[in-house]
Design a protein with these regions (language model features):
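Active-site helix of classical SDR
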Residues: 3, 11
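C-terminal helical subdomain
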Residues: 9, 27, 50-75, 79, ...
Length: 92
């Protein structure tokens, strides 16, 4: 989508501009995450999405938080300009 393309472009541009200062810039692209926002979906709608997820389950806010913590911590110190898909494989 255009909005996803814009996020990718902004992430890469900011990473290039800020890298010389030792600042890393990355983005998280969450897939289907079970939150109060998804509570309004029907079981049929949820199943249609879940059937496309390689890992066979919805993600959790904790899954996204773990990715953020990784990128913000020492493990992510040499990663910049990347978009990390936290999607259970739905995007493959």
């Amino acid at each position: 989508s255009a909005s996803k393309g814009a996020v990718i472009a902004m992430t890469r541009t900011a990473a290039k501009e800020l890298g010389a200062r030792g600042i890393t810039v990355n983005a998280i692209a969450p897939g289907f995450i079970e939150t109060p926002m998804t509570d309004g979906m029907t079981d049929q709608q949820k199943e249609a999405i879940l059937s496309r997820i390689t890992l066979g389950r919805a993600g959790t806010p904790e899954d996204v938080a773990a990715a953020v913590a990784f990128l913000a911590g020492e493990g992510g110190s040499y990663i910049t300009g990347q978009v990390l898909e936290v999607s259970g494989g739905i995007v493959m």
